[in-house]
Swiss-Prot record:
Domain description: The [KR]-[STA]-K motif is specifically recognized by the SETD7 methyltransferase.
Keyword hit for Cytoplasm: no
Organism listed in the record: Homo sapiens
Modified residues (N-acetylserine): S2
Protein name: Transcription initiation factor TFIID subunit 10
Cellular compartment(s): Nucleus
Coiled coil: none
UniProt PTM: Monomethylated at Lys-189 by SETD7, leading to increased affinity for RNA polymerase II. Lysine deamination at Lys-189 to form allysine is mediated by LOXL2. Allysine formation by LOXL2 results in release of TAF10 from promoters, leading to inhibition of TFIID-dependent transcription.
Family of the protein in this entry: Belongs to the TAF10 family.
Length: 218
């Protein structure tokens, strides 16, 4: 039985429709990864061979590669590790720790107080040449009130040392004056020197004290 030209095989129609050129069907988005796979990708580093993020980092794609190529200044500050502690306040770059009070200029030298303690104990049984009442009187006139007798005796010792140095300098000037005048021919161990104002004036000038010989009136 012959078939007319208008007739078509119903089974061949779908095949011809499939082979005919046409727009490509839209590609569906990949399904979301399971939670276990996402956890593995997050835990594995990008540089680990065979890790889930290795392909993305090697290919230059993905968030890990973008993070690696990001400039250092745009990255966040590196957090302090759990084992390390933040530098204390007052620490400087060379590793020397300075107290905050020392950084403000309140620098106090550390001196051993043992010799001073022994010296103060000796002052309790020492009687200076200048009486304590005299030293205390002039301290009160200067506006300083010392209740500790050891402080008064310490100031008395300082005054004695100052007067002794001036007297020794005046004596040296007197000896030099006697040597220059030629009176050193008669050498005697029992010779006594009389200090005058001419001997005291140059000795005091060395300490910044200027004195003048008083005028003599007849």
């Amino acid at each position: 039985m012959s078939c007319s030209g208008s007739g078509a095989d119903p089974e061949a129609a779908p095949a011809s429709a499939a082979s005919a050129p046409g727009p490509a069907p839209p590609v569906s988005a990949p399904a979301a990864l399971p939670s276990s796979t996402a956890a593995e990708n997050k835990a594995s580093p990008a540089g680990t061979a065979g890790g889930p993020g290795a392909g993305a980092a090697a290919g230059g794609t993905g968030p890990l590669a973008a993070r690696a190529g990001e400039p250092a200044e745009r990255r966040g500050a590196a957090p302090v590790s759990a084992g390390g502690a933040a530098p204390p306040e007052g620490a400087i770059s060379n590793g020397v720790y300075v107290l905050p009070s020392a950084a403000n200029g309140d620098v106090k030298p550390v001196v051993s107080s043992t010799p001073l303690v022994d010296f103060l104990m000796q002052l309790e049984d020492y009687t200076p040449t200048i009486p304590d009442a005299v030293t205390g009187y002039y301290l009160n006139r200067a506006g300083f009130e010392a209740s500790d007798p050891r402080i008064i005796r310490l100031i008395s010792l300082a005054a004695q040392k100052f007067i002794s140095d001036i007297a020794n300098d005046a004596l040296q000037h007197c000896k030099m004056k006697g040597t220059a005048s030629g009176s050193s021919r008669s050498k005697s161990k029992d010779r006594k020197y009389t200090l005058t104002m001419e001997d005291l004036t140059p000795a005091l000038s060395e300490y910044g004290i200027n004195v003048k010989k008083p005028h003599y009136f007849t």
